[in-house]
Amino acid sequence: MHLSELSHPNELHGLSSSELEDVARQIREKHLKTVSTSGGHLGPGLGVVELTLALYQTLDLDHDRVVWDVGHQAYPHKLITGRFNEFHTLRKKDGVAGYLKRSESSFDHFGAGHASTSISAALGMAIARDRQGQNHKCVAVIGDGALTGGMALEAINHAGHLPKTRLLVVLNDNDMSISPPVGALSNHLNRMRLSPPMQFLTGSAEEAVRHLPFMQGQVPAELNRIKEGMKRLAVPKVGAVFEELGFTYMGPVDGHDIGALVRTFQEAHRSEGPVLVHVATTKGKGYPYAEADQVGYHAQSAFDLTTGKSFPAKKPKPPSYSKVFGQTLVKLCEQDSRIVGITAAMATGTGLDLLQKAVPDQYVDVGIAEQHAVTLAAGMACDGLKPVVAIYSTFLQRAYDQLIHDVGIQKLPVTFVLDRAGIVGADGPTHQGQYDISYLRCVPNFTVMAPKDEAELQRMLVTGLRHNGPIALRIPRGSGEGVPCLEDGWEPLEIGRGELLAEGDDLLIVAYGAMVAPAMATAGLLQEQGIRATVVNARFLRPLDEALLVPLAKRIGRVVTMEEGCLAGGFGAAVMEALHDRDVLVPMLRLGIPDQLVDHASPDESKQALGLTPPQMADRICERFGSAFGDRLQRQTLSV
């Protein structure tokens, strides 16, 4: 069967192991070809090809439910659920999403993008099934990295107390989440993987037998029986932790042996209660470069399949904000042993991998445990350390109670660096950093700021570390503005003071963070039409520089705010409230993300769709205030 002919996963029923292996080969070829061209998650999907095929051969996907944790490993799932012919549009605007979306396919039973949610969702489906007298199967597929998340453990604890509720949890254990997983549970799983029977199961012994001249590529049944016996005898406590929590434990199973997987899943489906099947896989399986560098090939931009190297940029780019942050933090840590960098399993993405290599004693990775990361930092701050929590804007949402209860209320000096703040692009709505402005500006005692460029980022980091209270700094995804960075001697900013960048009498533009450069470009376009704008780099969301903004708004009489975040409760709303409280009631235009989700596309495409490019913003300003500008407006449409 050719993969392109597979329109429904139930068509896998009845295929032999060799036929499934041929489908697996085609999936890997398509997966590699597509990701090498368009970019995307590489290693996770390559590691679960056989797992996916074997699982789906034992299910009826018209009725049964499968919840994939995170969803970045579900490319094989997409390829066998009718999206083969559209797969070349992966992560592109209006194309196939990089994660699971209920709106994209009836086979995407639960959407995701964040880790550790699958067991809770699948258990909820199982309870709904039982209450409605139905009989379909409910399955959660979760990686060993996501299993470190507290939510996953909460769900396991709950499911274990429901002995009559049929639930299958498939643990995809590749000893890798994005960065290597940490913690006692991960260490326990690792001991399982490194036990002699497990090494025999997944190591070179079977391959050596298969290649003996007289074996003709086959493995005798006796060897399989020996392997199973060794597992039972030498690793009797492998699943003890899950058995104690109320699950029937099966495994470990070779995650690339389709026959063994099918037999195990069939046995698991016969159980009357919760079952955990432990599957040992290799992240990046089938592509040597991805197997050798499982962190580097977790996700990739477009790359050369032959060499495994990313294609060079068409023109040199400035360093990313993440890299500038990481390099600066390393230097600050070298100067002050009290500074500690904390990540929640995202060291590479946030730039903290640089700290891990340079000053490992001042680096902490808590795993996928954002709530713990925040309160851990609070505890450190209580006793004299200077914690810096580097975390994606979208993931900090998961620790909101800790921000308020453990840090804000107690006014503890913790510095938060929110990476990927604003529009992030192809990862789509689960990863857009569009909410942090709104959810941070109301937290008591917090100072909130955003830099206009790399050099200002460095100064803000120093500001945070010298401030005796909680402070949050948001930085966008991608390259900086190309402003030279200082090697040392960074001066802190005066908290609550903005920066006047340009002066004009017709319009006041107040921009925040990544929107400062577009604001200046917009002002330049307006200047060409005879409109002179004052431009302010707000720097601080909380506290706002009311001493600067109020007199300017009162004098100029027309205000535009620009932000890369939600308009609801956002930066523009903060400016409007501040002016209103001072009885400055002037016409305003707030530019940002309206009340909608931002779907997957490139950042530039998303900004175009939202009307946030400089030509579009200039046009919107002219439409809003055109009559007030009178004869000075040399009207022409700038956005095309």
UniProtKB/Swiss-Prot annotation:
Q: Which reaction does it catalyse?
A: D-glyceraldehyde 3-phosphate + pyruvate + H(+) = 1-deoxy-D-xylulose 5-phosphate + CO2
The record, for InterPro entries, names:
Dxylulose-5-P_synthase (IPR005477), THDP-binding (IPR029061), Transketo_C/PFOR_II (IPR009014), Transketolase-like_Pyr-bd (IPR005475), Transketolase_BS (IPR020826), Transketolase_C (IPR033248), Transketolase_CS (IPR049557)
Write out the residues that bind Mg(2+): D144, N174
**One cellular component (GO) term of this entry:** cytosol
Q: GO molecular function: any one?
A: 1-deoxy-D-xylulose-5-phosphate synthase activity
GO terms for biological process, alphabetical: 1-deoxy-D-xylulose 5-phosphate biosynthetic process; isopentenyl diphosphate biosynthetic process, methylerythritol 4-phosphate pathway; terpenoid biosynthetic process; thiamine biosynthetic process
Q: Write down how the cofactor binds this protein.
A: Binds 1 Mg(2+) ion per subunit. Binds 1 thiamine pyrophosphate per subunit.
Which Gene3D superfamilies does the entry link to? 3.40.50.920, 3.40.50.970
Pathway, per record: Metabolic intermediate biosynthesis; 1-deoxy-D-xylulose 5-phosphate biosynthesis; 1-deoxy-D-xylulose 5-phosphate from D-glyceraldehyde 3-phosphate and pyruvate: step 1/1
- Name the coenzymes or cofactors required: Mg(2+); thiamine diphosphate
- SMART domains assigned to the protein according to its UniProt record, in alphabetical order: Transket_pyr
Cystine pairs annotated here are none
Highest taxon, organism lineage: Bacteria
Describe the task this protein carries out. Answer: Catalyzes the acyloin condensation reaction between C atoms 2 and 3 of pyruvate and glyceraldehyde 3-phosphate to yield 1-deoxy-D-xylulose-5-phosphate (DXP).
Record note on quaternary structure? Homodimer.
- According to its UniProt record, which protein family does this protein belong to? Belongs to the transketolase family. DXPS subfamily.
Name listed for the protein in its UniProt record: 1-deoxy-D-xylulose-5-phosphate synthase
